[in-house]
Amino acid sequence: TEYISKNTVIPFLFDAARAKCKVAFENPGGPTIWDHLRDDPDRYIYTAVKHGAVQALPPEIAAGVEDVSARTQWNQKAPADFGLPTEIWREVVARRTRYAEVRAKLAAGEVREINDLITLNLDIRQFAQDVIERCEGPDLLRAFWNAIEGVTVLDPTCGSGAFLFAALNILEPLYETCLDRMEAFVADLERPADGHAPKKF
């Protein structure tokens, strides 16, 4: 439920915000929201995907990366330092390879569409939170605020309401982050640069 909600609600918000503040998404030669992904790739890759990736593979396992005939131990269970619960070495190597590929894409600035975060199984909630929290101008913040205020969620199953609650749990932190960022903008606006109270027009 949470997976479906975040991967439908958040892309809607980004598409709505993009329509009202295109420059934050498409700005050749200038900063965009996608820079967050490039500047800190690991922040948006789930911990489970990165598990054990910083450690060098044992020699007997690493030998099989290039030499298929050296994979005799790849079907054995990997220790906890390297593998997730129930993972065998073959799965560990595949996960590490995937992690390296995804991280390289992010670091190269190749991910520039919100749906790519779904395709690559990235932390789309953290990205949305960071984009709003780090807004440098009011236009993008206003665009997200309007999108959040105007979103309508329909529960297709009309069951217990779990889908609606999941959507609420996704929207509420973003709503609060918008308010916090608005307060910061207002505080900056009201803070006099020369020590005197600003004139009101």
Regions found by a protein language model. Give the residues of each.
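Class I S-adenosyl-L-methionine
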Residues: 1-157, 163-200
